Amino acid sequence: MATSKKGLISPGIFIPIFEKNGFITELDMFVFTQVCKNFKRWENENFPTFPISINLSRVHLENPDFISELERITKEYEIEPNLIEIELTESAIFDNTKILFKIMQTLKSVGFKISMDDFGSGYSSLNMLKDMPIDVLKLDRQFFITVGNAKKSQIVVSSIVQMAKQLDIKVVSEGVETVEQAEFLRLIGCDMAQGFLFARPMPIEEYEKLILDRYSVKGKEIN
């Protein structure tokens, strides 16, 4: 979120406020719609597209009918659901396991990918991973604050990555800020990494320029 005076505002600041006043559901649907609009525009412009992750608030768990609205929006803009990854936070998952598992299965049946965000930030249960219908596990940045020099942290992260692979779950490491962290994650077979080392949050115009620049460097032409 951005304002003209303060610039980018962290989701950690405005999301709790919106969850309290009930505006979060409207915000989530607005974001989802904008993503679908952009996918359609990129498709029309022959612009490279990649799956996009969208965070959904735990508030939606109180109204499972929201899935039909997500499906309606994707059909309106003729977007394949598998281009969208629905992110649910660790805290939401472990607070409402029975309800959420059913919702996750329904989302997957529609075609959406499911990811568990901020894994490791709370009281995660490794045993529960075998039952969760998720496609992607996003490791919380707390794992990597000391990963460059803490042997125990490296062992924990490596074990989680290997276990996820055995469960056919992709792993994304959040909060990567150093080359050493990225190299460690590459060596243990982590699927993807994100963090300030690669890019900071940016407006869509900057994102599009970044993609165009990188593709032009590779010698690919985009109409």
What does each model-found stretch correspond to?
Residues M1-K6, S57-P64, L83-K98, V110-N223:
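EAL-family c-di-GMP phosphodiesterase catalytic domain
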Residues M1-S4, I17, F23-I99, G175:
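Catalytic core of bacterial c-di-GMP phosphodiesterases, primarily the EAL and HD-GYP domains
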Residues F14:
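Conserved, function-defining core regions and hallmark residues within catalytic/recognition domains
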Residues K20-N21, A150:
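Residue-level signal for well-ordered alpha-helical positions
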Residues I103:
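Conserved functional hotspot residues or short segments at active or partner-binding sites
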